Amino acid sequence: MSPARRCRGMRAAVAASVGLSEGPAGSRSGRLFRPPSPAPAAPGARLLRLPGSGAVQAASPERAGWTEALRAAVAELRAGAVVAVPTDTLYGLACAASCSAALRAVYRLKGRSEAKPLAVCLGRVADVYRYCRVRVPEGLLKDLLPGPVTLVMERSEELNKDLNPFTPLVGIRIPDHAFMQDLAQMFEGPLALTSANLSSQASSLNVEEFQDLWPQLSLVIDGGQIGDGQSPECRLGSTVVDLSVPGKFGIIRPGCALESTTAILQQKYGLLPSHASYL
């Protein structure tokens, strides 16, 4: 059976088990999760509050909404769907990195060249060692992750070969965002992650800015506005650093945390700057 048919079959089974339904043939029944707002909700939208810190009481209504959104997102991801999510830098599109059909769907809906890589989102620093060959001290990883950085390292055999097949490297993200960390941990596997926008268009800081993508998504998780929306750095995305060469680092994309990241790499760990090697 092809990966695409397996993913569709997984989606149908999981949808049935949690009471979700498909839309008409050839369409996706997108559902919107968003915090309460005085503004009118979109018709049919489901409203859930996602506390930014995740520090809510176990039995509170806020925790119930948080958990419901997590369970819905995990169900869709395990079924091979694409889900829009908030991160610490921008809104992103996530799918199961193990599902080749879902990876192709991400490229297709963004209009993105398949020669451009997708990052991998994990829930814990300890998970990095499973999916990468790490050549830096553990303290360095913990100083930068979770955070607004993407660390590029040599990939391990654990990752799907259809994920970025053109490079032996992979970019690792652990966003400093409680929902994303909870989601990655509950999913129990690597998530492919990219920005929620059409290629060549501006990145998104709220869900309305990528509303044209909603019909192609299975689920939209609305965590509210990301950042102030005004500063020049707010749409730069994560700082991308190549750590694949021992003792050196390369800045692939300056991003929003360049100064603090390079200070840690050079002043604390003595790494030397080099040319970036990640495409």
From Swiss-Prot:
Membrane topology (UniProt): Peripheral membrane protein
Keyword Cell membrane: yes
Keyword Ubl conjugation: no
Effect of residue 221 to T: In GAMOS10; decreased formation of tRNA threonylcarbamoyladenosine modification
Expression sites (tissue/organ): Ubiquitously expressed.
One Pfam match: Sua5_yciO_yrdC
Free-text comment about domains: The mitochondrial targeting sequence (MTS) is weak and only mediates import of a small fraction of YRDC in mitochondria.
Function: Cytoplasmic and mitochondrial threonylcarbamoyl-AMP synthase required for the formation of a threonylcarbamoyl group on adenosine at position 37 (t(6)A37) in tRNAs that read codons beginning with adenine. Catalyzes the conversion of L-threonine, HCO(3)(-)/CO(2) and ATP to give threonylcarbamoyl-AMP (TC-AMP) as the acyladenylate intermediate, with the release of diphosphate. Participates in t(6)A37 formation in cytoplasmic and mitochondrial tRNAs. May regulate the activity of some transporters.
Family: Belongs to the SUA5 family.
Record disease entry: Galloway-Mowat syndrome 10: A form of Galloway-Mowat syndrome, a severe renal-neurological disease characterized by early-onset nephrotic syndrome associated with microcephaly, central nervous system abnormalities, developmental delays, and a propensity for seizures. Brain anomalies include gyration defects ranging from lissencephaly to pachygyria and polymicrogyria, and cerebellar hypoplasia. Most patients show facial dysmorphism characterized by a small, narrow forehead, large/floppy ears, deep-set eyes, and micrognathia.
Designated name of the protein: Threonylcarbamoyl-AMP synthase
Source organism of the structure: Homo sapiens
